[in-house]
Amino acid sequence: MFYSGLLTEGGRKETDMREAASLRQQRRMKQAVQFIHKDSADLLPLDGLKKLGSSKDMQPHNILQRRLMETNLSKLRSGPRVPWASKTNKLNQAKSEGLKKSEEDDMILVSCQCAGKDVKALVDTGCLYNLISLACVDRLGLKEHVKSHKHEGEKLSLPRHLKVVGQIEHLVITLGSLRLDCPAAVVDDNEKNLSLGLQTLRSLKCIINLDKHRLIMGKTDKEEIPFVETVSLNEDNTSEA
């Protein structure tokens, strides 16, 4: 009986030791899991922790990434868009001004007189007709000379999609020592300009010398007209008014 009691007591101690070891092991595993997820899990709201499970998408760091992305997208959508629109408008405006400046640099202008006033005329080999804008007609006081377009049903081939609103049958232009009496189509344009078309340039036997910056007129008695500095036609002709 004595030995039996000793064996029973020894068995109990061994059982207690095993249970204690098992509890310690469970606590260590629990602490390890908590340590692994501490930095990310503590930052998550409780509803994000309820269903972590074993899925990769449901792990704390993935949930955090999704929340951050959702927050950033929400800020972008609700943030002010005016600065971006303003920046885009400025870029488009700068691009437009750059293209316009490039076109103006390619223009050939010569000094002439029309209706007793100095005008800088554009030498336009890309258009068959002489053109004068409504603004230029107004400045030169030629409104009473404007007549309705003869070929109203006929669409003239004009650059820049200009609209013909009338014509002047006898537009007197003094170019150098030459006095020209030529027709011109009146176009609806805000630019105060006058342009000499290909028909007039051919009739004057004109040669454009880009090396000397001269417009040479005539075949036998040649006359050279120097190019003038290229500036905005609107600003230049306004200053002459």
UniProtKB/Swiss-Prot annotation:
- Entry-linked Pfam families: Asp_protease (PF09668)
| Biological-process GO terms, alphabetical | proteolysis
Q: Which organism is it from?
A: Homo sapiens
The record ties this protein, via InterPro entries, to: NRIP_C (IPR033821), Peptidase_aspartic_DDI1-type (IPR019103), Peptidase_aspartic_dom_sf (IPR021109)
Q: What would you give as a GO molecular function for this chain, any one?
A: aspartic-type endopeptidase activity
Question: According to the lineage, what is the superkingdom?
Answer: Eukaryota
PANTHER family recorded for this chain?
ASPARTYL PROTEASE DDI-RELATED (PTHR12917), NUCLEAR RECEPTOR-INTERACTING PROTEIN 3 (PTHR12917:SF16)
Name this protein carries in UniProt:
Nuclear receptor-interacting protein 3
